[in-house]
């Protein structure tokens, strides 16, 4: 089994992005699966092509994209990607879309094929906080989540794909009082646990357990 794991470069006012820093530190093999690591730019109009080229070259069984979610306390496997770009800030190319449909011939939303409940459970069992999330936002994280799902729908039907957000690093919250942070070691531990869950649930679907939210 081969798993492509992507992480974004820094964006906004931050000089570091825990996503790519954690991805770079993953082992090359987890639970018998080969791990292919890829840095992608935080740019709406470029990121999808970078991932598409990697999928075409590597032919992975799974794609797991990692992104930063400042303000969240836990690692959060994402349930659904929506067909909308609505940038709160400019991306790294200076582009800021407003209520922009990603693909006119795409679905309004795509649900992940990853076992997100099993992933959240495995992360918590590794001693790292985790919860299933029902919104990946409308910035480049949701964009690449949706784009990979669109690729699966139109071009790469055999892959399974999804997205997971991770919190700020401690050094990112020095001037952000009361903002949650998680160490890079815990990020790596949590992502590794999530990948182990992906491998162990391959061909079995997700586990049946409560991870829903009221709001």
Swiss-Prot record:
Cross-referenced CDD domains: Peptidase_C15 (cd00501)
Domain of life, per lineage: Bacteria
Keywords of this entry: Cytoplasm, Hydrolase, Protease, Thiol protease
GO MF terms, alphabetically ordered: pyroglutamyl-peptidase activity
Catalytic activity field: Release of an N-terminal pyroglutamyl group from a polypeptide, the second amino acid generally not being Pro
Main location, first listed in the record: cytoplasm
Subcellular locations according to the entry: Cytoplasm
Annotated catalytic residues: 78, 141, 165
Keyword match Protease: yes
Enzyme Commission number(s): 3.4.19.3
Family: Belongs to the peptidase C15 family.
Quaternary context: Homotetramer.
Biological role stated in the UniProt entry: Removes 5-oxoproline from various penultimate amino acid residues except L-proline.
Protein name: Pyrrolidone-carboxylate peptidase
């Amino acid at each position: 089994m081969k798993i492509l794991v992507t992480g974004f470069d820094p964006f906004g006012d931050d000089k570091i992005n825990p996503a790519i820093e954690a991805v770079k530190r993953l082992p090359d093999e987890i639970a018998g699966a080969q791990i292919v690591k890829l840095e992608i730019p935080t740019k709406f109009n470029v990121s999808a092509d970078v991932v598409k080229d990697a999928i075409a070259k590597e032919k992975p069984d799974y794609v797991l994209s990692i992104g930063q979610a400042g303000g969240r306390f836990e690692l959060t496997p994402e349930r659904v990607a929506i067909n909308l770009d609505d940038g709160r800030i400019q991306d790294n190319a200076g582009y800021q879309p407003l209520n922009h449909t990603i693909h006119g011939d795409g679905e309004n939303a795509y649900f992940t094929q990853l076992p997100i409940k099993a992933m959240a459970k495995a992360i918590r069992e590794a001693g790292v906080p985790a919860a299933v999330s029902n919104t990946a936002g409308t910035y480049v994280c949701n964009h690449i989540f949706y784009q990979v799902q669109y690729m699966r729908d139109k071009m790469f039907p055999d892959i399974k794909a999804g997205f997971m957000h991770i919190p700020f690093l401690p050094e990112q919250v020095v001037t952000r009082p009361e903002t949650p942070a998680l160490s890079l070691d815990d990020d790596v531990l949590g992502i590794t646990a999530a990948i182990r869950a992906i491998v162990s649930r391959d061909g079995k679907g997700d586990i049946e357990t409560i991870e829903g939210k009221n709001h």
